Amino acid sequence: VRLLEKPALKDSHRGPAQLRGTLRHQRHCTCGEVAAKCPVWGPVLAWLPSHDNQPLAVKLKKLMEGIAPDASASGSASWVVESYQDDFKLPFLEDPSLEIRVIHLTRDVRSWVHSRSRDGRKRGHWLPGFIPLLRWWRMSARHEMQLNRCGKPVFRLGYEELALRPEQTLRRLCDWLNLEFAEAMLAPVAQSSSHILAGNRVRFDAERGSTIYYDAEWMAMGASVAQLALAWPPLAALNRRLVYSAKRR
């Protein structure tokens, strides 16, 4: 969705705006092609500049035109995945012709705060994890409330459960999506059929993508503000409910 939204003038130097121009002939998609030749993104990126004032739903339907043939040819259940982490825009939420399910992926508060406060620790800031802790609490509580009200099936998935117990977690997720689990899912980069133009650079790292990997650096650290904050029952309950309960509805 972020790539489809009309870029603001102040963001003309950023990826979404640049991909409407020459960058689409340089940046590679995870399918292996440069963006301009990607069977999914290529036609859309060429079409967008003259249609950027169209509603987001129209743009999404244009994008899905390039995905639909692969989905129908597979002969099994297929899902189009939109995974921009800060995105709560669902233009098709009320479209009766589409089945929409939500996977709510949440990272343990201690791991998230440790990662977000890294720069503050290097600069010697006092309590560098305090602001990230408040942000995790605010965002996670808000997202849980929004998803409880969205009226769609929601699968609660903990980042730690996925990374530390990948096969068990993926089998449970596949069952929920009516998909058959395949061992190849445990090697995400090598077996991916995705079309991703922006995001974590590890998506192109074949070695690191050969398995699902978890950075457990935070576990070796001493007591942090996030670890101490888990002594507060409401925060501990939210972290447990979103990350470790394996709850779905």
What residue ranges belong to the model's regions?
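Alpha-helix initiation/capping motif
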Residues: 49, 53, 129-132, 220
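PAPS-dependent sulfation machinery
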Residues: 1-80, 213
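PAPS-dependent sulfotransferase catalytic domain
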Residues: 56-73, 88-90, 96-186
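Short, compositionally biased low-complexity segments
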Residues: 30-39, 110-113, 202-211
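PAPS-dependent sulfotransferases, especially Golgi type II membrane carbohydrate sulfotransferases
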Residues: 58, 68, 72, 117-120, ...
